[in-house]
């Protein structure tokens, strides 16, 4: 029953919440004055559309993550793509690659905030080129991750034999029947270990390089904003700080609840540490949360959106109270 909640119901609940929250988020953005967000509106729309796509894929391609001794592996448990085939394997790899694409999505947001502060023409006159570059960067991240999964992460017969008893004990099925992405760091042939280490190094390098870029761009933007505060209007400077703060929160959420558990699953098998099954449940569940948690965080971080929610709440409360008052007067 717990497996059904983790792998079937929780992704569907997350998807439903994403399809409620993200349209509201987009409505808030595009009903503000156009000069408030400028072209940044379209990057936020791109972000919301990505969240909707990811939430659907999270339901259609449900994954399970497990580790055993020196091996980490990811399999498909339910849905349309369980039967072993190259196409179904690519669907599993694509599910992982979408998570990697979110690195690119966050990166283009940080670059945009940096360029706005320096009044770059890419944020104004040539914004269509910036959006094109943003799309291409997201595709590049996706393709890079997909390629690594195919050439280095594809579970060999040796790896499947290594985890055969563990899979039979945990899932009641044979390891040869699963579409599997994995790494095997020890107790294996040189080729298997080499591919596993190379895959992990490349995955880690992409992750660390992306997060480092966020930090550098955020620090440079803050430094420039502090200089600008002397010349720019207080309102403009304050709003730019609020947008950057919202972006930092937007970035921290997937890093903490989604990417950090991934790193643990990659690295604990290096030392032969087997994580408890409950941690695997947590990780699978957490990977689906940011598609609706992130927009909520942005809405709550920006005062203009908080005020609109507050005003809506007050108006709704007042309209509900008025009929009851009239009834008492009668």
Curated annotation (Swiss-Prot):
Annotated source species: Caenorhabditis elegans
Superkingdom as given in the UniProt entry: Eukaryota
Predominant cellular place of this UniProt entry's protein: membrane
Record field: transmembrane: 6-26, 43-63, 98-118, 135-155, 200-220, 253-273, 285-305
Name the UniProt record assigns to this protein: Serpentine receptor class J-38
Membrane association type: Multi-pass membrane protein
Keyword Transmembrane helix in record: yes
Family of the protein in this entry: Belongs to the nematode receptor-like protein srj family.
């Amino acid at each position: 029953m717990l497996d059904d909640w983790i792998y079937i119901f929780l992704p569907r609940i997350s998807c439903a919440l994403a399809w409620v929250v993200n349209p509201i988020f987009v409505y808030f953005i595009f009903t503000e004055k156009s000069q408030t967000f400028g072209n940044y509106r379209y990057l936020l729309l791109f972000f919301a559309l990505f969240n909707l796509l990811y939430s659907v894929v999270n339901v259609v391609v449900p994954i399970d993550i497990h580790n055993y001794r020196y091996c980490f592996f990811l399999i498909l448990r339910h849905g349309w793509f369980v039967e072993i085939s190259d196409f179904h394997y690519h669907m599993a790899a694509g599910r992982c690659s979408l998570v990697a694409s979110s690195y690119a999505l966050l990166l283009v947001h940080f670059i945009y905030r940096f360029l706005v502060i320096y009044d770059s023409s890419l944020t104004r006159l040539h914004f269509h080129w910036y959006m094109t570059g943003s799309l291409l960067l997201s595709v590049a991240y996706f393709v890079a991750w997909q390629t690594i999964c195919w050439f280095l992460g594809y579970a060999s017969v040796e790896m499947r034999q290594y985890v055969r008893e563990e899979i039979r004990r945990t899932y009641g099925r044979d390891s040869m029947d699963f579409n599997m992405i994995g790494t095997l760091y020890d107790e294996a042939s040189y080729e298997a270990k080499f591919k596993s280490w190379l895959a992990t190094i490349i995955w880690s390098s992409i992750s660390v390089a992306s997060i480092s870029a966020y930090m550098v761009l955020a620090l440079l933007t803050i430094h420039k904003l502090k200089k600008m505060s002397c010349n720019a209007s207080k309102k403009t400077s304050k709003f730019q700080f609020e947008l950057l703060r919202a972006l930092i929160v937007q970035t921290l959420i997937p890093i903490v609840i989604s990417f950090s558990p991934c790193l643990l699953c990659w690295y604990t098998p290096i030392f032969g540490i087997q994580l408890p099954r409950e941690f695997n449940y947590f990780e699978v569940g957490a990977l689906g949360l940011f598609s609706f948690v992130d927009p909520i965080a942005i809405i709550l971080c920006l005062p203009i959106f908080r005020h609109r929610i507050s005003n809506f709440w007050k108006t709704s409360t007042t309209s509900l109270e008025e009929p009851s008052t009239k009834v008492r007067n009668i």
